[in-house]
Swiss-Prot record:
Cellular localization per UniProt: Cytoplasm
Keyword Acyltransferase (UniProt): yes
UniProt pathway annotation: Amino-acid biosynthesis; L-arginine biosynthesis; N(2)-acetyl-L-ornithine from L-glutamate: step 1/4
Record family assignment: Belongs to the acetyltransferase family. ArgA subfamily.
Taxon lineage: Bacteria, Pseudomonadati, Pseudomonadota, Gammaproteobacteria, Pseudomonadales
Gene assigned in the entry: argA
Organism: Pseudomonas putida (strain GB-1)
This protein's name: Amino-acid acetyltransferase
Amino-acid biosynthesis listed as a keyword: yes
Amino acid sequence: MPDYVNWLRHASPYINAHRDCTFVVMLPGDGVEHPNFGNIVHDLVLLHSLGVRLVLVHGSRPQIESRLADRGLTPHYHRGMRITDAATLDCVIDAVGALRLAIEARLSMDIAASPMQGSRLRVASGNLVTARPIGVLEGVDYHHTGEVRRVDRKGISRLLDERSIVLLSPLGYSPTGEIFNLACEDVATRAAIELGADKLLLFGAEPGLLDADGKLVRELRPQQVAPHLQRLGSDYQGELLDAAAEACKGGVARSHIVSYAEDGALLTELFTRGGGGTLVSQEQFEVVREASIEDVGGLLELISPLEEQGILVRRSREVLEREIEQFSVVEREGMIIACAALYPIADSEAGELACLAVNPEYRHGGRGDELLERIESRARQMGLNTLFVLTTRTAHWFRERGFAPSGVERLPAARASLYNYQRNSKIFEKAL
C-alpha cells in the first residue's frame, strides 16, 4: 500500500475536525524570508481549501532592519521592544506595506500553480486592528510603538464567512488617525482571543520549544510555562511560548509552536496524532480511566497486532464486551493508546494483571508504569494482596518493577486449572 494512502486514512479524522474551525497563524518576518516560505504558503492554501477559516498575521522585523540600514538609521530597543520614532515609523510603514503586498501576491501565485487552479482565493486586509501608544516606560519614550487595543472581531468574522483569508499586518490605527508599530505576536494573540479561535499557530526557527538539553518539549499546560520563560530570558522562543500561554489563558483551546524552516511542519502538527512541534493547552492531553463499552473497538485495534504476534492471548469482540469492566485504558484525543486488565481470581485474595499493551508510537512515555500503578491500586481497593502476571515476551519489564518469578503451583486453583501449557507463559507474582 502506498504511504500516502495510509497517511490519508490517519489524517481523515483531523480533516473533518478542522473544517469550519478558525486558526490564527503567526509568521515572523524571518519566516517570510526563509526558503521554505513558499511551502508554508502552499500548506496555508491547502488548509483554506479544506474549510479552515484562516487569519494570517505576519511580522516584519528583518525587513524593517533592512530599511533602517538603507537609510543609515540605527535601530533602538528597550526591554526587547523597538523604539519607533518618526524616521523609524517611515521605515516600518514601507517595510510592512511591501511585505503585505508580497504575501498577497504569493498566495495568489500559489493557487494558480496548484491543482486548485481555477478556484477563487481572496485575501482581505484593512484597518482591522485598533492600537494605542505604549507611551513612556522607565523613562523611555516609545513614540510610535503601540499595543493592541481592540481587534475588529465582527469585521474579521464577516470576511471569514465570505471565505477570505484575512491578512493582519503589525500595524495598528488609533481613532485619531495615528499609526502604531505593533509586535506581530501581540497582534496574533489578541486576534486569537477576541475571535475565539480554535487554534493559535506560531512559527519559529526551532521545531518547537526546546528544553535545556535541546530536546523538544511536546506538550505543556499554561501553568507549566513559567520555568521555561525564566530559563529562556529574552530568547525569541520565550516570546513565542509566552504568546501561546497567554492565548490559552484567554480562552483559545490550543496553541502550537512549529518551525518555519521545516517543510511540512504545519501539516505534521495538524494532521498527525503525535504532531511535530510544541502544543500548549488547558485541555488534558491524555486521561487514564476505566474502560467502557464504547472502547471495545479501540481496544481491538490496539491489541490485535500483539495477538497476531503471539504476545497477547486472543480476545474476541464478544469477550471484550463481556469483560470490559476489568479494563483500564489511556485515552489520547479519542484514541485508546494503552490498556491493562485486572481479573480477581476466584476463592483467593489474588488477582491477575493481563492484556497490558501500549501503542508502539507511545511506548517511551511511562504509560505502562502508569497503568501498572492503577491496576495495583485497584487490586488493593478490592482487598487483594497478590498480583500475578503471565507473559511470554516481557519478563524483564515485570521483574524490573518488583515482580518475582513464580510457578503454576503458586497460582490459586481457579487460575492454575486454566493454565495453557502449550503457550508456556512465564509466571510472576508481586505482593501488594
